[in-house]
């Protein structure tokens, strides 16, 4: 069975192009004819399915394999820019420098159409066909009130769109980073947001237009990308307006001010439309479309998480239930969980756009839910938690003061592709959740993170490794070089003068390596750095970093004493 992920959409922006994709399923529609008579014969070779595609589009009732719609990726010998057209939706969508799009945008538009209910997806057959609402949409005249009403019904059934509208209604003017930080499942890979202070600091420290553009356009977490995509739809509907926002932050003794262009405000029309999500006498609440796939995305045990969350959502739809009652219900389904996990899931349902009501210590989902069903093959399997989820369950119960969103550090620390996100979340924990000062540096010839408190400073190297970090000699030498540069503070040694991140009164330093876990001869390397530099340091994994943060925030460990943990020249193990 094919593995598809519906419910979360990136890089599909233009509503008119969405209509083209949906319209191809209507036999003899303008788009359908254009594809059969012109685009597919010209753009797609027989090798890539030309004749089969034309035959499939020539039927009265069109049901298409997902693979035929999406097409193939970039074949060997081609680049993404010159890859041949190999899918029906690729040929449907106009490109910027060519007549068609690649498989990635094609997949994004298909996800969009399925996620808001214009297409029905058959999981067993891996096919798509037009829904009743999708047919109504294709038959509506472009720009008409009928079309707007259908789009309203579809978009307001999409929980993440409702979440963004609700946040803007409550908080006013918000950037994509502020919105992204509150969208998605708590402490989970697949829902990361770049801490906004890091962006503002970076913008303020560069005069390069190229670097500013890179920070504003390319530096995003996954949730930030979802926000940007969804807000593009809401702008086209006239529900939000994009308006630059000025942000001022303070890091250490320095104040940084800059502007972020991707910031949004609710319009009067948007405020009115939001009532379809909350419901009122004049605005009947539109049912929310939740697909099983959207209940987890990147976690290795996502099917387990999707099933657990499906059971909780179904259980909370009828009457108010306590977390203890939810636990009993999960046990009846063969799922063993903790109160803390259940509460995080319930809070996350609000974060993805469901309306969750709380009375005393009981919860109820106020929305009517459509589309949510555990696939038969997934309901019959005995799904197990991953080792990461088991670790999260263990640590979650210990975090009474630290925000559970930082549990994502457990995912990121073992994901070798997420170094940057790991650095961002580490510094956000230390400077946002806690009261250390400092920032992510993370560029060439700079440490990843530096933090300080009063006279104590810590130079941090973040390393995300799937099988444990052994601290190779090259990285050990790199840390020694940072220690030496910080000691000498000679611009000729390093013109970027990264050490200026520390206040002038900081005079007692440690170094630290942060990773998911450690392996090999890392302790010997730490000892060697100490012997060469005279500076003490340690390794600390994500679990112990979180436990340290909890002890600090709970008042069991002072900020000054937290630095003493790094005197050991080996691995920090909390209580």
Description of each model-found segment:
Residues 378-575:
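Catalytic core segments in nucleotide and nucleic-acid processing enzymes
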Residues 1-404:
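Donor-sugar nucleotide-binding helix/loop cap in glycosyltransferases
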């Amino acid at each position: 069975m094919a593995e598809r992920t519906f419910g979360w959409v990136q890089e599909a922006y233009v509503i008119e192009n969405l209509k083209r994709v949906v319209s191809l399923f209507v036999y003899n529609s303008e788009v359908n004819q254009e594809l059969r008579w012109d685009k597919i014969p010209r753009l797609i070779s027989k090798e890539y399915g030309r004749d089969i595609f034309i035959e499939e589009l020539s039927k009265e009732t069109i049901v298409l394999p997902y693979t035929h719609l999406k097409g193939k990726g970039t074949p060997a010998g081609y680049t993404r820019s010159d890859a041949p057209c190999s899918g029906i939706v690729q040929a449907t969508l106009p490109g910027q420098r060519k007549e068609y799009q690649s498989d990635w945008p094609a997949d994004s538009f298909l996800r969009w159409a399925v996620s808001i209910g214009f297409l029905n997806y058959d999981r067993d057959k891996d096919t798509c066909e037009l829904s009743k609402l999708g047919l109504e949409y294709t038959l509506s005249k472009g720009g008409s009130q009928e079309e707007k009403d259908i789009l309203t019904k579809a978009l307001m059934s999409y929980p993440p769109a409702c979440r963004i509208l609700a946040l803007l209604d409550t908080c006013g003017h918000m950037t994509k980073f502020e919105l992204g930080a509150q969208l998605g499942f708590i402490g989970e890979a697949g829902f990361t947001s770049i801490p906004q202070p890091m962006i503002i600091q970076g913008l303020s420290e560069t005069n390069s237009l190229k670097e500013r553009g890179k920070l504003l356009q390319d530096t995003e977490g996954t949730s930030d990308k979802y926000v940007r995509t969804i807000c593009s739809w809401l702008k086209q509907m006239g529900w939000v307006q994009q308006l630059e926002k000025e942000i001022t932050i303070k890091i250490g003794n320095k104040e940084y001010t800059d502007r972020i262009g991707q910031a949004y405000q609710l319009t009067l029309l948007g405020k009115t439309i939001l009532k379809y999500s909350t419901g009122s006498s004049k605005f009947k609440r539109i049912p929310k479309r939740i697909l099983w796939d959207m209940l987890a995305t990147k976690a290795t045990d996502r099917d387990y998480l999707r099933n657990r969350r499906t059971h909780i959502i179904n259980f909370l739809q009828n009457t108010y239930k306590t977390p203890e009652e939810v636990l009993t219900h999960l046990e009846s389904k063969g799922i063993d969980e903790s109160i803390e996990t259940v509460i995080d899931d319930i809070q996350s349902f609000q974060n993805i756009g469901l309306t969750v009501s709380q009375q005393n210590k009981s919860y109820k989902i106020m929305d009517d839910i459509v589309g949510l069903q555990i696939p038969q093959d997934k309901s019959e399997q005995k799904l197990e938690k991953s080792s990461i989820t088991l670790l999260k369950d263990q640590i979650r119960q210990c975090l009474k003061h630290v925000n559970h969103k930082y549990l994502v550090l457990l995912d990121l620390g073992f994901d070798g592709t997420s170094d940057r996100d790991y650095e961002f979340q580490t510094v956000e924990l230390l400077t946002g959740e806690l009261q250390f000062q400092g920032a992510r540096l993370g560029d060439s010839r700079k440490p990843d993170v530096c933090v300080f408190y009063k006279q104590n400073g810590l130079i941090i190297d973040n390393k995300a490794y799937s099988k444990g970090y052994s601290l190779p000699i090259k990285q050990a030498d790199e840390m020694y070089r940072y220690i030496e540069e910080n000691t000498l503070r000679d611009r000729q040694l390093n013109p970027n003068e990264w050490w200026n991140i520390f206040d002038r009164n900081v005079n007692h330093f440690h170094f630290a390596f942060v990773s998911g876990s450690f392996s090999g001869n890392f302790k010997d390397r730490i000892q060697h750095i100490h012997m060469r530099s005279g500076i003490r340091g340690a390794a600390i994994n994500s679990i112990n970093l979180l436990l340290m943060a909890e002890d600090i925030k709970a008042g069991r460990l002072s900020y000054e004493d937290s630095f003493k943990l790094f005197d050991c020249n080996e691995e920090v193990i909390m209580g």
